[in-house]
Amino acid sequence: MTQPTNEEILHVCDRFDLCGRVIKVKPCGDGHINYTYIVTTRRDDCDCRCRYTVQIVNTDIFKKPDEVMENIVHVTEHIRAGLRRNGEDTERGTLRVVYTKDGKYSYTDGEGRYWRVYRFVEDTVCRQTVDSPATFARVGEAFGDFQRRLSDFDASLLYESIPNFHNTQKRYADFLSAVERDAAGRAHGVQEEIRFITDRAEKCSLIVDALASGELPLRVTHNDTKLSNILLDETTDEAVCIIDLDTVMPGSALYDFGDSIRTGAASAAEDEPDLDKVHFLPEMFKAYAEGFIKGTGGALTEREVRMLPDGGYIITLEQAIRFLGDYLDGDTYYHTKYPEHNLVRARTQLKLVADMEACMPELREFVDGLI
């Protein structure tokens, strides 16, 4: 994916139905996944200014970008309709896709780059770190509210933008294949870690089977539930809307809950080499669970609430499986900074899994009390 020139960006902007002419283009972010620009326009007849988020979607990661955009349009329009019914802010409460002048939600340029545009959400900020249980509870409430607003949307209408993303059963099968291949000749040095995972093989089908049987309902899932994907009001610090919707797809609410717990209820970074510093933090789990359930406003089933601890456990185990599998394959998927990086990552996740197992009775008792 090549970075565009300023002239190319202006050409693309002219294809979209923007208000006024472009007067400023500012790069935003590090371009790790998508190239992003903040574009300012001005209407000459009234000197009104508007801002837009203009992006190139990384089609190396998202192979079917039209499906990604259809998902985003479905979800944001559903949320906006609910905001409108309730008399809430339809401009800031969810992302607004800007269409091209010929009525499409994207534009592909001569270089094959796939462009999209959102209205910029004004007077908001992003924060990167969770510094307290209270902050984590607010993150939980925001993502719980996302579930609530989409609880009456038919998730089966969405495409699976990354197939089998949280199919832990398949992730485990892929891991066993990596062990058998031993492509990098590393399996002999990680037998303890391999055994830890294989001893928990039956756990991998827990959520997948519950979805298949109907024990858990199919829901819209965000799949990247971190603080930086919540826009906060710059004055009140209250959550305004959820962003980064590229991985929105059908799944279980436990996936989103578990993804937050895996990182937010850990005492250290996922690549902390000193395992004595790595602990699961029950108080952070409890804070997030309270916020999440409050945000859902009763949209979760009793079974979903009771299985919230399983969400944190399974997603953490799944990530350990992925890290260790990539280590065995010779680090072909995750970017690494040193030869043992993926192994270090896997070990932190396995330490969290072990800690969660020890805390599981306490966690189950806590969520049962929230029903």
Predicted regions and their residues:
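Short, surface-exposed acidic
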Residues: L18-K24, R186, A299-L308
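ATP-dependent phospho-/nucleotidyl transfer catalytic cores
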Residues: K26-D30, Q55-I56, F62-D66, T124-A137, ...
